[in-house]
Design a protein with these regions (language model features):
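Glycine-rich, proline-tolerant flexible connector loops at the mouths of alpha/beta enzymes
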Residues: 39-63, 75-77, 203-209, 299-313
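Short, acidic/polar
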Residues: 20-32, 85-89, 181-194, 277-289
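Conserved, mostly hydrophobic/aromatic
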Residues: 36, 60, 93, 142, ...
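Acidic (Asp/Glu)-rich catalytic clusters
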Residues: 29-34, 57-66, 90-100, 193-194, ...
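Alpha-helix-loop-beta-strand connector modules within alpha/beta enzyme cores
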Residues: 51-74, 134-141, 222, 313-321
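Flexible, glycine-rich active-site loops centered on histidine and acidic residues
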Residues: 8-20, 79-152
Length: 321
């Protein structure tokens, strides 16, 4: 795909997948690798909308060769899972996948939106300020466990405590695990500037991304200046978007109606306004707008993640541009 100024663009395209039908998940991952998608990321929650994420992606690593794997988002909540266990799970997957894990996290959605996913399982979903502090401590602990060249790690925080913890490192799992942090707020963008390899925003227009991207770059430069370092010459930029693609007007309108029934009219309207919706040429033009705004990676939630025709149609459109 080329940007409007004619320069080549090497954007990567990733799939966001949820669901409980393992055969569909497996077959879609195999197809995604064949079609040239960069990554395949599976949902994580305790609810019945999906299976266990880390079990699934470990299995997928054994039946694929190149495609990157990881969670759509994995949670650092102390009530949910011991962070040392999570670090060990990640390093193990990095080993068995031959270095293909990409780890994704963030502070999480609002209390009003997300509490319903946690309360049935005895977990009190923290407020925004608490979640931001948990994220900051959690990624610091993970960074120490994965990357610090010491035999033991100790950390004393408000939410996480580690004393003399060690993780076995091998040639493969010593390779840095790429860390994506989803962030829109000042504080979470500061955390991303300090620790992330990939910074991600979600469901915004190219114009909004341009503004937020500039803000993130300023935060990153300020972090480097304040600390006298150049932590990363370039942090990749990612955006999460919904996708509805069809090769005819009638099919497109049908998919939009189904989407509205599934999500509800008001939610669907907001998503459609910010998503990649249209025929291949229309979606390609929208992608060019995002790449011109600074997007390196597209994290794509197709209306039906198991729609093989749509997945193929999308990648064919990218190949012809």
């Amino acid at each position: 795909m080329k940007s409007s100024n004619g320069s080549n663009n090497n954007s990567s395209f990733c799939l966001e997948v949820w669901g409980t039908d393992y055969n569909k998940i497996k077959n879609t991952c195999i197809l995604a690798e064949k079609l040239g998608y960069y990554g395949f990321y599976y949902g994580e929650s305790l609810a019945d909308i999906d299976l266990d994420c880390w079990t699934i992606i470990s299995n997928l690593s054994a039946i694929t060769n190149k495609i990157k794997l990881g969670p759509v988002i994995t949670y650092l909540l102390p009530q949910y899972r011991n962070t040392f266990l999570l670090a060990k799970q990640a390093m193990t997957l990095q080993e068995v996948s031959n270095g293909r894990l990409e780890f994704r996290t963030g502070a999480g959605a609002t209390l009003q939106w997300s509490s319903q996913w946690w309360h049935p399982y005895g977990i009190d979903y923290p407020n925004n300020a608490q979640r931001v502090s948990i994220l900051e401590e959690g990624v610091q602990v993970l960074d120490m466990l994965w990357n610090k060249q010491t035999t033991a790690v100790s950390f004393e925080g408000k939410y996480f405590k580690v004393k003399g913890a060690t993780l076995q490192k091998t040639t493969i799992n010593q390779k840095r695990i790429p860390l994506t942090i989803a962030a829109k707020q000042n504080k979470t963008m500061q955390i991303a500037a300090k620790y992330a390899d990939i910074w991600e925003s979600s469901y915004i227009t190219p114009e909004q991304f341009t503004s937020l991207n500039k803000k993130f770059d300023d935060i990153h430069k300020q972090f480097n200046s304040d600390n006298g370092v150049n932590r990363s010459k370039k942090i990749s930029k990612s955006i999460e978007l919904d996708v509805i693609i069809a090769d005819s007007d009638s099919d497109l309108e049908y998919k939009k109606r189904v989407f509205a029934m599934e999500r509800g009219p008001s939610v669907a309207h907001q998503i459609l306004k910010h998503g990649l919706v249209g025929k291949p040429d229309e979606i390609t033009e929208k992608l060019i707008e995002y790449t011109n705004a600074g997007v390196d990676q597209f994290f794509l939630a197709f209306q039906d993640p198991f729609d093989s025709k749509a997945l193929d149609l999308f990648m064919k459109a990218m190949a012809t541009r």
